[in-house]
């Protein structure tokens, strides 16, 4: 999982990327290709 300042570039890396909020943190998840996971912070 990458940790980045801004998720704007992370959510456009793959068509299946979704931006999700969990426990106050913002994540990008991808069920088709899990190597595109990222977290903001």
From Swiss-Prot:
A GO cellular component entry from the record: ribonucleoprotein complex
One Pfam family it belongs to: Ribosomal_L36
Source superkingdom: Bacteria
Organism: Rhodospirillum centenum (strain ATCC 51521 / SW)
Protein name: Large ribosomal subunit protein bL36
GO molecular function: structural constituent of ribosome
Annotated HAMAP family: Ribosomal_bL36
Keywords from the named record: Ribonucleoprotein, Ribosomal protein
Lineage: Bacteria, Pseudomonadati, Pseudomonadota, Alphaproteobacteria, Rhodospirillales
InterPro entries: Ribosomal_bL36 (IPR000473), Ribosomal_bL36_sp (IPR035977), Ribosomal_L36_bact (IPR047621)
UniProt record, GO biological process: translation
Family classification: Belongs to the bacterial ribosomal protein bL36 family.
């Amino acid at each position: 999982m990458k940790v980045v300042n801004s998720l704007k570039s992370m959510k456009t890396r793959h068509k299946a990327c979704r931006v999700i909020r969990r426990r106050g943190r913002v994540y990008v998840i991808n069920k088709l290709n899990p190597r595109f996971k990222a977290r903001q912070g």
